[in-house]
């Protein structure tokens, strides 16, 4: 796997197209690679029963596939600094995911050479997802990319007409909630298996040990995977996580929730659709790390009339920490909260 230098990248450059078949095995590997046991990603009957075309790959799979696509092009000497993702459609078994990308900008940020990319994933129906990526790239004049040792949490000015109920949410960061499992070499390998990612930094290789990271790291866009709960706790209904046998209680038995916390729901709203997210990456995650996260609401629009009825666009922040209390990444994402009668 060769690595690009910043000087050799051209704005407008097209990345080599990647075609990736989506099969039943792809979905199984997706469950293994992301630890996401939500039934619409592995149970076709259930997924169709709630109006989907079939079972479909999750957002973490899309992030992994875009990540593999970028590093296939730039090589392992570049580091991801930020990615964005917007899901537009679903990739299901039988589809061929076509991944395309373009260099949109070359810049220096704080003296660090960077490249910005615009990416798309499409199938026979149309565009399934779009993504952006900002990568730090080695330079012949400035040398190798330097791993980050810290990262700031993003800030946002609230909407000038933010509803009164949402003002009380601002500045309130939840307690930390830890993932169900520590990061492991095996889990990273499953992640690579699901999208056929050959990045040598994601394995205990001589290259990784001799690299700027001084050892194996985890794919940076796996932030949400590292905080997924135990498999026996994951489901549409957390109290009855197996949709095929609702009588089965969570296993191992769950104690009262003492840590973490979700995001508040605007009054009168009942449903949620993710609109998009932007992740930024800090201290690299490594096997053996125990990742936890906090939640905070940064913004909320006034009530809007949408295709789904009245709703609010709510911007939330997840901050991810390792066991040393270092920030390993942030996830800034917007949700459409809808389904109520309005008038709140």
Residue ranges and their predicted role:
Residues 1-79, 140-276, 342-344:
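Hot-dog-fold acyl-thioester-processing enzymes
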Residues 73-84, 88-93:
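Mid-chain, well-packed structural core segment of small domains
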Residues 1-16, 91-177, 273-344:
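HotDog/MaoC-like acyl-thioester-processing domains
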